[in-house]
Amino acid sequence: MPCYTRPMIGDAATLTRRSRSLATLPFLLCCSTLLFSADWKISYLTFADVSETLRMFADSGLPGSNISASAAWNRWIRDQDREVRARIDRGEEDSISNLILYGTSYTSLPRLESAESAGKTGGPLSEAAMARVRALVIAVHSAQPNERIRIVRDFLKRKGIAAGDASHYLTANLQRFADEQRAYQQKLVEAGHSGDMNEVLSTRGTLYQNRGLSADTSLMTNYALEDTLSSLIAKNFLASGSVRRIAVIGPGLDFTNKHNGYDFYPLQTIQPFAAMETALRLNLAKPDNIEVFTLDLNPSVNAHIARLAHEALSGRPYIVQLPRDSEDEWPSGAENYWQHFGEIIGVQAKPLPVPQTLTGVTLRAVSIAPRFASRITPLDANVVTQRVALPPARGFDLVIATNILVYYDRFQQALAMASIARMMNPGGIFLSNDALSAHHVQSLEFLDRHSVSFSTKGRFGDNVLSYRRK
């Protein structure tokens, strides 16, 4: 993993940054030592911050919801932060399992169809899955591993896994991962059989509350967000020029996602740029003053974004690869979004070659202009336990949290919503594609639920919820 020095966080820790600069000598030595201006303070949620949320959840029985004193809350919220951050390693283990299932950069073996196809519940892995485990182990021990394989190698080293034990560890991890995927699917089936739509939504909205925190990302989610914002504009919920500062919570890092599992291009982040371009395309923002802040607790994500922003200050563009699988059968709107992504904030670039094993995959590449890449600032913040303390009128006008709050229970989601509300300007918009807690701070007004399909056959898509800060 990239080296990481996490800033000290006290009751109101300050992360300092020079205006428009992420770089000093320590940054060059360790790219994830993030330096911000005194304007940006990361604070734990106080008892006063969450008093409204605690009242709503007093009888829920969820951990932390029955706390009635400030001192007890201060202890609990810090313990909660440590517990949430401890889930990052399990998320990395999940990403490594996806790399075993679908990766093409280290082997020409056929990809597996899904985690469930790796073997039977509680039983050994299939020979096809074991062959891919062995291929990854060989790659990890090779002299010149690629970027993702180096990450796996460094992760195993950090976990204290000896070279001779790597195969056993990765096998057990894949078995665990496959069993969990089956359990998630079973929970959804059982909720569907209940006939209770509230039960279905609750199950979907908290499905991964005990799972490791994944850093996966997807282009199509950003298409759904743009379509949703267009709808809000049509309904007069958003005005031209109303967005200056955007917060992207959990921006993601394209390691090997659970849908397509591509790993033949460098690690990349997309959502910060997608949010920026959408705001510009819809005339919600102006190129000269738009800013994007990413809030994440994953050191690898923060380091990656800090590095790209630093390199942009030196005039280096940021290149993203945009794959499209013809088997996904995108509707025309999705195809148009993919075809024109990056036209406002960059120029078309030469894409990397697609591996022969990935038939039907087309690739576009976009070189994002340094003037836009340099406008992204990463913040090490856990939105469930912390908030960015912002001066008046310096809050966020648009907040995006996709595929992230599903990793938390209803009380944790409500805490996140309380944090988000406190970071927003009045009239600001909050978007999420997770079914969130119906019990949340009154300062967030529910506006709409917008459905967007990613397939002409309607097999999958997103439901985007929108809220407005009163």
Question: What are these model-predicted stretches?
Answer:
Residues 326, 441-469:
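Conserved Class I S-adenosyl-L-methionine
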Residues 426-435:
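Conserved beta-strand signature within the Rossmann-like core of class I S-adenosyl-L-methionine
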